[in-house]
């Protein structure tokens, strides 16, 4: 019977705050939905990719160079290497497209056949699924590469191309202009790559003793693998940021609502104590509804994670090639979400009751004496303000808890909205910043074999204005591989602080932070000590740069050769024609820019989802707290109405308080948005790409405008509420 009475009382109190509790439930639901969805997605994605790498025997190390059968035998003698396989990878230009031909490997980096069969002769090939799907290529179609016609006999997927990356500058290539085709083993006369696998770690120092090579690329240093690891970190970052903010704000609203309810019902609580009701029972009466709210809201959020995760799978499958992604429940994150929501609601509700639980029944039942402040002579500034303005200031200072929570909620909404738009701006600005401040090339030409520096392969003409040579190698720092580009000290196509190239290494800021070095410090690169001479604010085309003269002081055996050309042209179409005549492989600046456009097209839906959640957060907080303020100030508004204040003047008072909150929350939100963007930039950076926070002025204006519009709905709610007030109802709440 007692339990039944307590339950009835709890339901009645829930009914009294139904609108606010509905808003809090929405915040908790979204927090649980975000948390459960992103962590479930991360776990499923990690499991699927790990299984794919294991099943298709993803190579632990890829060696690049010119290899013979004798080189393979040398490696077979090593007890640490379990599997070795030769193959050839070569890029060709075919019109506006880049075609990468790869000889099939049967032991390592095995492809997955989706349709057809594998090639058996040199006249056949299989195409990677991303390109075939985008260009609507079917079995038995003809695929032309370098003037040779190949019959398409199959469509495949590859563990190397889960992310459709072409190079360090094109890590999200356009399937319309970049094709990957696999050919038979005997298609190429020689091999330029060796794939290695081992049950233990393969050390580069050991391989160096066995045979010469151009580059040693461990699995963790491949672009495909780095992007996979980067996405895992990004999921975790988003899974913590958004849910934490939503949970904390909902718990704060619970604290404020229950605190106010207890002040209103202090006589009832005193009566319950006098009748022998224990503190535990009183806690149950007032906190049960909030605990149930947290439990059921988070449970609904967990249930909704299924369709939302499926939606993310579809979005992500447009960015990566992993059709095996399928939803399954991970009970750990469901339990964590339910526990955080339920305990958080219970703990914050309990904290709001601590003061009144300590009181004796007589004190609780006593009439509350309003706090009277010492009368002060108003300053000249305050006297010059209107009554409405002074009332708005006084009301804000009198209700510090609600005022602070309103400002905090609007700041959080502003910060998350600016963060979402700024994330989009930062990615968009990478390529523009790179070509505006650093790179001035129109083409990058990759030579199949290094040439002596005094040998020119392209003649300067009306189509080719300027060309500058460079040697692109791999540099190992702290057991990680990085692009090492050696060029002349007077290079102008790249803005490299030429006076610093002869003094040491010029590195991007991202590398400097990662290695914990600054100008003048030394690092060990390829087992040689080198000095950092300059640090550049680069986001794209990340590499270690130095001059031939300085490199020869570090690496005595360095040959005077080049394998890369940076080319400028006033007539790009004529330049393309000249490069094609020379049968040279090249990439254009426009193709590098297209990489980021493709990435943004794929991420557009995710950005929209983040923006929607930010708007929901702001609208919910404003609705809940505004409704609470209106309920509490019923008598004040009734008194103002009786004293002759029109509804328009009362709304002006509310509007001025709203403007004061906006003036505080929007700048705080801007600071929070910038801080969030700076905090997560490391998770969105890799050895080939570093995100630099960059927010456009338009994003600031749009964010402030959206938050102001959301806040203006407060006036509509207030107008409707004040219209419904009656004198009798106002007298009922006079005591409060």
What are these language model-derived features?
Residues 113-183, 499-550:
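Hydrophobic secondary-structure segments that place a key small or acidic residue at a functional site
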Residues 62-63, 387-514, 518-521, 527, ...:
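Juxtamembrane segments of multi-pass membrane proteins
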Residues 15-25, 30-58, 309-315, 319, ...:
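Alpha-helical transmembrane segments
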Residues 41, 45-49, 99-105, 203-249, ...:
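Peri-transmembrane interface segments
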Residues 255-259, 265-267, 291-323, 331-358, ...:
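Small-residue-rich transmembrane alpha-helices
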Residues 17, 252-291, 620-660:
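Interfacial "coupling" helices/loops that link adjacent transmembrane helices in transporter permeases
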Residues 38-39, 79, 85-120, 151-159, ...:
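The feature marks short, hydrophobic/small-residue-biased sequence motifs that occur predominantly
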Residues 1-33, 261, 287, 291, ...:
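N-terminal Sec/SRP start-transfer signal
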């Amino acid at each position: 019977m007692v339990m039944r009475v307590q339950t009835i009382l709890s339901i009645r109190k829930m009914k009294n705050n139904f609108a606010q509790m509905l808003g809090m439930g929405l915040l908790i639901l979204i927090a649980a939905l975000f948390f459960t969805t992103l962590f479930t997605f991360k776990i499923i994605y990690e499991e699927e990719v790990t299984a794919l790498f294991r099943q298709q025997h993803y190579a632990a190390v890829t060696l690049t160079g010119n290899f013979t059968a004798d080189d393979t035998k040398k490696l077979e003698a090593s007890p640490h290497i379990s599997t070795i396989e030769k193959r050839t990878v070569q890029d060709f230009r075919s019109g506006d497209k880049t075609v990468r031909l790869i000889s099939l490997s049967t032991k390592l980096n095995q492809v997955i056949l989706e349709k057809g069969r594998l090639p058996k002769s040199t006249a056949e090939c299989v195409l990677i699924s991303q390109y075939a799907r985008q260009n609507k290529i079917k079995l038995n179609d003809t695929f032309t590469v370098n003037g040779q016609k190949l019959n398409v006999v199959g469509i495949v997927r590859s563990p190397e191309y889960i992310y459709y990356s072409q190079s360090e500058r094109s890590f999200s290539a356009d399937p319309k202009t970049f094709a990957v085709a696999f050919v038979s083993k005997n298609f190429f006369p020689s091999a330029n790559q060796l794939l290695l696998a081992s049950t233990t770690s393969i050390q580069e120092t050991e391989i160096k003793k066995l045979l010469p090579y151009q580059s040693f690329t461990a699995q963790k240093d491949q672009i495909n693998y780095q992007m996979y690891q980067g996405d895992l970190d990004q999921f975790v970052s988003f899974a913590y940021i958004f849910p934490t903010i939503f949970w904390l704000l909902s718990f704060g609203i619970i604290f404020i609502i229950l605190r106010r309810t207890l002040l209103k019902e202090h006589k009832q609580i005193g009566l319950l104590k006098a009748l022998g009701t224990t503190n535990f029972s009183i806690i149950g009466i007032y906190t049960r509804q909030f605990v149930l709210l947290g439990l059921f809201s988070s449970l609904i959020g967990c249930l909704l994670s299924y369709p939302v995760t499926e939606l993310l799978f579809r979005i992500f499958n447009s960015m990566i090639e992993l059709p095996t992604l399928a939803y399954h429940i991970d009970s750990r994150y469901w339990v964590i979400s339910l526990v955080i929501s339920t305990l958080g609601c219970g703990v914050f509700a309990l904290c709001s009751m601590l003061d009144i639980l300590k009181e004796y029944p007589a004190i609780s039942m006593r009439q509350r004496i309003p706090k009277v402040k010492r009368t002060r002579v108003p300053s000249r500034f305050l006297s010059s303000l209107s009554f409405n303005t002074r009332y708005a200031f006084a009301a804000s200072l009198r209700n510090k808890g609600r005022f602070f929570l309103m400002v905090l909620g609007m700041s959080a909404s502003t910060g998350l909205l600016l963060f979402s738009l700024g994330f989009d701006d930062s990615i968009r600005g990478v390529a523009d910043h790179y070509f505006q401040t650093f790179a001035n090339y129109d083409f990058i030409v990759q030579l199949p074999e290094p040439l002596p520096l005094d040998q020119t392969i392209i003649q300067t003409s009306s189509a080719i204005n300027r060309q500058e040579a460079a040697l692109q190698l791999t540099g190992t720092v702290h057991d990680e591989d990085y692009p090492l580009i050696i060029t002349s000290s007077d290079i102008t196509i790249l803005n490299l602080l030429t006076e610093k190239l002869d003094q040491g290494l010029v590195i991007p800021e991202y590398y400097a932070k990662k290695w914990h070095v600054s100008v003048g410090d030394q690092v060990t690169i390829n087992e040689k000590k080198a000095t950092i001479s300059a640090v550049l604010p680069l986001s794209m085309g990340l590499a270690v740069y130095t001059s031939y003269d300085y490199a020869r002081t570090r690496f005595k055996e360095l040959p005077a050769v080049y394998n890369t050309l940076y080319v400028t042209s006033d007539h790009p179409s004529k330049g393309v024609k000249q490069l094609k005549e020379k049968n040279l492989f090249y990439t254009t600046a426009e193709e590098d820019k297209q990489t980021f456009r493709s990435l943004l097209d794929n991420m557009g839906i995710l950005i929209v989802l983040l923006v929607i959640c930010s708007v929901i957060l702001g609208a919910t907080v404003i609705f809940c707290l505004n409704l609470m303020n209106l309920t509490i100030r019923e008598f004040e508004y009734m008194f103002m109405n009786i004293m002759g204040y029109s509804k328009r003047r009362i709304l002006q008072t509310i509007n001025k308080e709203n403007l004061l909150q906006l003036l505080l929350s929007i700048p705080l939100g801007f600071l929070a948005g910038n801080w969030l963007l700076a905090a997560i930039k490391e998770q969105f950076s890799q050895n080939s790409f570093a995100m630099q926070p960059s927010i456009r002025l338009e994003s600031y204006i749009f964010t402030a405008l959206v938050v102001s519009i959301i806040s203006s709905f407060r006036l509509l709610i207030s107008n409707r509420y004040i219209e419904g007030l009656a004198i009798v109802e106002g007298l009922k709440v006079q005591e409060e």
